[in-house]
């Protein structure tokens, strides 16, 4: 079955690609497996030179990469360029820090009856990455940069609607100097993942995607006893308390909700506002959301572009329609736009009761649900009333309230007076059904290593 690039702003097919055959996939795995034998022996200094050269190319080609991303999945050009530059930063971070992050960890040898004892980090081998379309370069680089700097080799199975981004990443890594076979893109369907992951030459996997996709890959990896990192969905809370800077909170709330056209696992989705400031927040928030310009993502004046897929747009529309039918109030937006492409307007919904699906579920589009909380206890209760636990945000100047949110929100991340963002320097991941394992920081690179205990008499 062909793999197509479809412009979500028009719905038109731009380019089609032929999927890899079983023999081509087998050859790619064999090439990676052979390459690992010598690549793992390369020095950190050599890998760092290749990583920095890759970063140089990403920076030099940021405009071209941005245009490609925008064409394939609809994010605005500004957001796409920022993503390309962030990828360069990710490669540079691991180029600079990998050797220190993976240094031997000495133990007190005398206490274990040895002359020397330590833990040594060693690469796992061939790693399969199953990546989504919403951040087509950054999500893959969050895997590629640490995995390669640790001495592993990678196979990328990207979402089928972003083939050009997937091929570009393998190309830019090769042009950066990494040897042939270190990083390969496989243009295959999701149905091919199981056979690849079960192949004994593949040592581990990482997946960013939906909960069902994570369950599938997690089950296969569990059966094969292969280490896996899963970063799945999120229904992130954004709490606003009376002591917060309200205007700053509203501004950040808008950005947090519509970033990437609302299609981010760490986008703020459920806005939980203290009753004392609820009306003021809603008025300001609705006004700002309604004023956003929806349009051509290549237009620099556009704030919100199309959703990446027609199915995604239809799912968002149905979630809003179901909420309205159940009694929720649509404060702005809420209707499909009569134009080509897969656009959906910024939408704010209030009066959501606990029995509505929207109370807990994730909406992957520019739709904000706003909840009223009588006190901090109720704010925390609503924040945790979801099966997900990826990111979270809380706005308050009160240090006691800040500590409460840090301690009691069940999530992999909490941002106080800001919005959840991924940084190379900070661990990224979730709890509950948002997955397990961590990306980025020291934790992310160590996920791709075996720590070997060394004891010398």
From Swiss-Prot:
Keyword list, A-Z: NADP, Oxidoreductase, Tricarboxylic acid cycle
Enzyme class at the top of the EC tree: oxidoreductase
SUPFAM superfamilies: ALDH-like (SSF53720)
Entry GO MF terms: aldehyde dehydrogenase [NAD(P)+] activity; succinate-semialdehyde dehydrogenase (NAD+) activity; succinate-semialdehyde dehydrogenase (NADP+) activity; succinate-semialdehyde dehydrogenase [NAD(P)+] activity
One GO biological process term: tricarboxylic acid cycle
One Pfam family from the record: Aldedh
Cited CDD domains: ALDH_SSADH1_GabD1 (cd07100)
Alphabetical list of Gene3D superfamilies matching this protein: Aldehyde Dehydrogenase, Chain A, domain 1 (3.40.605.10), Aldehyde Dehydrogenase, Chain A, domain 2 (3.40.309.10)
Signal peptide: none
Protein residues bound to NADP(+): 133-134, 157-160, 209-210, 232, 362
InterPro entries documented for this protein: Ald_DH/histidinol_DH (IPR016161), Ald_DH_C (IPR016163), Ald_DH_CS_CYS (IPR016160), Ald_DH_N (IPR016162), Aldehyde_DH_dom (IPR015590), ALDH_GabD1-like (IPR044148), GABD/Sad-like (IPR047110)
Purpose: Catalyzes the NADP(+)-dependent oxidation of succinate semialdehyde to succinate. It is believed to be the main source of succinate semialdehyde dehydrogenase activity in Mycobacterium. NAD(+) can substitute for NADP(+), but enzymatic activity is three times reduced.
The name this protein goes by in its record: Succinate-semialdehyde dehydrogenase [NADP(+)] 1
Species of provenance: Mycobacterium tuberculosis (strain ATCC 25618 / H37Rv)
């Amino acid at each position: 079955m062909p793999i197509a690039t479809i412009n979500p702003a028009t719905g038109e097919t731009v380019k089609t690609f032929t999927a890899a055959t079983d023999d081509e996939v087998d050859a790619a795995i064999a090439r990676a497996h052979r390459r690992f034998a010598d690549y793992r022996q390369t020095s950190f200094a050599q890998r760092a030179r290749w990583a920095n050269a890759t970063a140089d190319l990403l920076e030099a080609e940021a405009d071209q990469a941005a245009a490609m991303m925008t064409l394939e999945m609809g994010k605005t050009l500004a957001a796409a360029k920022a993503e390309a530059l962030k990828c360069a930063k990710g490669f540079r971070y691991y180029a600079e820090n990998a050797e220190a992050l993976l240094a031997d960890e000495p133990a007190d040898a005398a206490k274990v009856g040895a002359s020397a004892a330590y833990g040594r980090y060693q690469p796992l081998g061939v790693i399969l990455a199953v990546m989504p379309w919403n951040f087509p370069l950054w999500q893959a680089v969050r895997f590629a940069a640490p995995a390669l700097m640790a001495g592993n080799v990678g196979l990328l199975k990207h979402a089928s609607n972003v083939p050009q981004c997937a091929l570009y990443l393998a190309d830019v890594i090769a042009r950066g100097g990494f040897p042939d076979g270190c990083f390969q893109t496989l243009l295959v369907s999701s149905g091919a993942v199981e056979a690849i992951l079960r192949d004994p030459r593949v040592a581990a996997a990482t997946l960013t995607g939906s909960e069902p996709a994570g369950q599938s890959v997690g089950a296969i990896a569990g059966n094969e006893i292969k280490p896996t990192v899963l970063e799945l969905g999120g229904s992130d809370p954004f709490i606003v308390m009376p002591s917060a800077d309200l205007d700053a909170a509203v501004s950040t709330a808008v950005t947090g909700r519509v970033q990437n056209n609302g299609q981010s696992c760490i986008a703020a989705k459920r806005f939980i506002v203290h009753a004392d400031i609820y009306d003021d927040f809603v008025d300001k928030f609705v006004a700002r959301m309604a004023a956003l310009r929806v349009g051509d993502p290549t237009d620099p004046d556009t704030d919100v572009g199309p959703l990446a897929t027609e199915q995604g747009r239809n799912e968002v529309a149905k979630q809003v329609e179901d909420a309205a039918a159940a009694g929720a109030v649509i404060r702005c937006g809420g209707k499909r736009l009569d134009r080509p492409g897969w656009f959906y307007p910024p939408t704010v919904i209030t009066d959501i009761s606990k029995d509505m699906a929207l109370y807990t579920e994730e909406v992957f589009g520019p739709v904000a649900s706003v909840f009223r909380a009588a006190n901090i206890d109720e704010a925390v209760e609503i924040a945790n009333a979801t099966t997900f636990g990826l990111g979270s945000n809380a706005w308050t100047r009160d240090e006691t309230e800040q500590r409460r949110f840090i301690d009691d929100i069940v999530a992999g991340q909490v941002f106080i007076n800001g919005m959840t963002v991924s940084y190379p320097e900070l661990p990224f991941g979730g709890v509950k059904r948002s997955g397990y394992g961590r990306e980025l920081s020291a934790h992310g690179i160590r996920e791709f290593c075996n720590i070997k205990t060394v004891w010398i008499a």
